[in-house]
Amino acid sequence: MSHSLWVEKYRPMDLSTYVGNEHLKEKVKVYLESEDVPHLLLFGKAGTGKTTLAKIVVNNIDCDYMYINASDENKVDDVRNKIKTFASSVGFKSLKVIILDECDYLTPNAQAALRNLMETFSKHCRFILTCNYVERIIDPIQSRCQSYKVVPPSKKEVAQQMVNILKEENCTFELDDIALIVNAGYPDIRRVINSAQRQVVPVYEDGLGGELQIDQSSVIQNNYKLQLLEMLSNGSKLNDIRQLIADNSISDYSELYRLLYDEVETYGKGK
């Protein structure tokens, strides 16, 4: 059983192992075959494979690339200096690609600087931007990109991926436990995999195998979101919904607001 992070160890390296988004994979395949890519804006919920897809692109075309996490480097100088240095330097390849992850964390001024850099270096440098909230990205950037919504694979596909990982790690498991973990973490695939790895207990002295032992209380604690969405879907009484929220120790209400915002289309249909 590996002690490295499973989310990194089993991150897909090419389109053949990337789960879901078949319609988007066809478009990316065309880019890979042409050895070129336009500016891309990949948006969607956290943990659904946006960054993975961006890395598949740069790892499968002939390019030099740089990765920037905008949640850590989101100020004007951070963006301008790092990108300008990379884009203007002499490279080994004719094409350069910059992955700007979580770009919805960029300040408005930083986004304005990014727009100018995209124009200045457009001949030989492409940008792949990822974000959870596309409405936070200024229009001039959106208009310069091919925008694609990355949707989560089905729960069945996520469960099968989890089964494959556990088998590869020589870990025993119950299918009901996998279903519980998937339901609690979906649609965030990263959260599902991390949750499973945390709850695997080594069963051999040599550390080469393990057993998935679910902490029911931990999973249920994280499952209040699913309960809340179900109650909203079923038209439960407002006091019951308030009680559910009160019964769960929620330290970050912004996460709850994001959940409701993300699911408004799903649970608002026909209302």
Regions found by a protein language model. Give the residues of each.
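AAA+ P-loop NTPase domains with strong preference for DNA replication initiators
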Residues: 156, 163-271
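P-loop/Walker A NTP-binding region and its immediately flanking N-terminal helices
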Residues: 1-151, 156-157, 163, 167, ...
